[in-house]
């Protein structure tokens, strides 16, 4: 039997491009060339470029997402997606694959687009009984009345792009005069802006996967940092940020965080790897955001959780691919 042809897609159109490429490297190290024919497909503003497992370029037909290597046309059996942000995390790439009938790891169009839209996701989950910070969605900066917004949400508050990840374009606003510049910054990154009340407390994050067909929590990690908040620098470049797994919280709260993360995963209809971020405030877990294409670089949180939980990444990937290709 021929080996499944796996397309590892990476890159993207945002400042998360570099993180995606690092995530792809980790996946490549955990996908066996003995089990799969692996092709790395890189997307940028110029389109797709494709490489075989020797890093030699191959031709990609974007109209049907097939490859041509040594004169042979290859149909892709499964896609492993590591594109953070648009178009890999917001449903656009998933829609493209659905139209072409290409199978892919991770969330479908609806789950991806809902999860990536922070304001809509928070509203949906709040209706399901999940605690989230108070927030206002900004469609046009001309609509903002700073005094009314501060009266409703309080200070400090957070301003963030409604549709971006890795804390890009996020500001912590402490004075009313900082609000409009923060919103302008967020609009430079995303199409909509979310202004959110600040919830003070311990930052936690929890991973979720499907293991043996069962939605399973991985571990809870505690995040300690010296920055004002867990921004891009604190996540990827700081030498003082501490990511502690397992989180140093009581067992009841730890288990509650894992149960809640599984519940959110199911409510959003997610598949594949997933991470949910929280603030623990006065014994209550407030959801900050979810990640349906979580970072998988050596500096990322989910690989650390997998290591603690003794969940080998290659085994989890094998299971996901087997389900997509109907091969054991």
PLM feature spans:
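Active-site nucleotide/adenylate-binding loops and adjacent lid/helix of ATP-dependent enzymes
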Residues: 2-10, 14, 22, 114-201
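Hydrophobic beta-strand scaffold residues
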Residues: 38, 103-104, 132, 157, ...
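Short, flexible, mixed-charge acidic loops at enzyme active sites
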Residues: 53-59, 95, 230-237, 292
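A glycine- and small-aliphatic-rich helix-loop capping segment at beta-alpha/alpha-beta transitions
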Residues: 95-104, 175, 180, 308-311
């Amino acid at each position: 039997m021929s080996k499944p042809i796996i397309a590892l897609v990476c890159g993207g159109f945002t400042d998360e491009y570099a993180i995606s490429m690092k995530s792809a490297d980790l996946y490549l190290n955990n996908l066996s060339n003995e089990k799969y024919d692996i092709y790395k497909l890189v997307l940028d503003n110029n389109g797709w470029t494709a490489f075989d497992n020797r890093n030699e370029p191959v031709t990609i037909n974007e109209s049907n997402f097939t490859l041509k290597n040594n004169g042979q046309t290859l149909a892709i059996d499964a896609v492993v997606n590591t594109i953070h942000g648009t178009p890999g995390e917001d449903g656009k790439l998933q829609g493209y694959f659905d139209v072409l009938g290409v199978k892919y790891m991770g969330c479908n169009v609806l789950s991806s687009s809902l999860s990536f839209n922070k304001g809509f996701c928070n509203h949906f989950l709040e209706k399901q009984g999940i605690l989230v910070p108070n927030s206002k969605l900004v469609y046009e900066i001309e609509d903002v009345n700073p005094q009314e917004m501060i009266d409703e949400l309080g200070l400090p508050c957070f301003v963030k792009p409604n549709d971006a990840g890795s804390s890009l374009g996020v500001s912590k606003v402490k004075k009313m005069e900082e609000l409009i510049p923060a919103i302008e910054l967020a609009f430079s990154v995303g199409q909509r802006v979310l202004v959110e009340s600040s919830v003070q407390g311990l930052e936690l994050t929890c991973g979720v996967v499907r293991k043996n067909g069962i939605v399973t929590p991985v571990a809870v990690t505690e995040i300690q940092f010296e920055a004002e908040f867990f921004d891009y620098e604190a996540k990827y470049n700081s030498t003082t940020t501490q990511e502690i797994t397992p989180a140093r919280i009581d067992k009841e709260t730890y288990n509650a965080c894992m149960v809640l993360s599984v519940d959110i995963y199911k409510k959003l209809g997610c598949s594949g790897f997933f991470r949910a971020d929280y603030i623990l405030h006065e014994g209550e877990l407030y959801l900050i955001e979810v990640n349906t294409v979580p970072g998988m670089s050596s500096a990322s949180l989910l690989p650390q959780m997998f290591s603690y939980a003794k969940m080998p990444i290659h085994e989890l990937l094998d299971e996901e691919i087997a389900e997509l290709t109907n091969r054991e």
